[in-house]
Amino acid sequence: TDTLLYDFKKRYDLVVGNPPFSKLKAKDAKKYLENNINKNTTNTFEFFLEKALAISDYVSMIMPKAILNTPEFSDTREILSHKKIDCIQDYGENGFKGVLVETICMFIDTVGIPNETKVESLTLKQSVIQKQKYITDMKYPYWIIYRDKFFDNISQRLEFDKFTVFRDRQITNSNTTQEKKADCLRVIKSRNISDDGKEIVDIPGYDSYIKKETVEALSAYKYVGNQNVYLTPNMTYKPRVMRNTKNVVVNGSVAVLIPKEDIHLTEKQMEYFSSDEYRKFYQIARNYQTRSLNVDATSVFFYGVLKECCNG
């Protein structure tokens, strides 16, 4: 019997689960999505979670940490925010030995009224009692489970949601070369952006180039020479931002930040992204994740521009 499709005739006191985390093909997911609230996922764990919430008064379930922040699970977060979440245990990458997936366990009272949530981190070795509405605050694009006064103070100094993001998926080792030629553009990779974001660093054996005629057919080409966009390394807790420069193109290890409005960052505003203060803030904003650190459509929200009044 397929548990996900089975029509349970009675309600249960408790469901405990460690469901499979696997993405199904659209045609295989179709039968499960019919009765699912979240129509934007094909991940089996989410189907099991929704099923458990529907048939039980209490649910304790292991799930990927990505549920906290990825766009795919925004509808799931909306469902959960109305349940009473007693505890979120964050295992980081230590949940399953040898499995490079970050996991959490959520303890959910499906009939209770949201109040306080205990957030426990096995990797940070810390435990804190949070107001559930504080960590699931709708003014942010996803849950911030380690939110604190420091985070709130920095938030007051920043203007959020100023950029959209582009990340290349076409420039690879197969269409680039380490040989610099006249008909080539420099490919900027994450390590080429200095720690303070002020210069492009040459790294022998790492630097690469791509033929102009090759890159002209790629999506990233539209940003070549556009000095109104900004570059930031992807997958790092050492963010830094630099203005795009001429005759370069970026690969997927660097995200292109595209201003939503006609804004031009000052030197101080760009410098702030590589400050210790902002980097500490950014770790909290990313829930101390170690795997899913892409600068994506939701996390780019937190590339906040320092307010001019705070530039001193």
Labelled PLM ranges:
Residues 1-162:
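Signature of N6-adenine DNA methyltransferases within the class I
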Residues 149-312:
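Polybasic, glycine- and aromatic-enriched phosphate-binding surface used to engage nucleic acids
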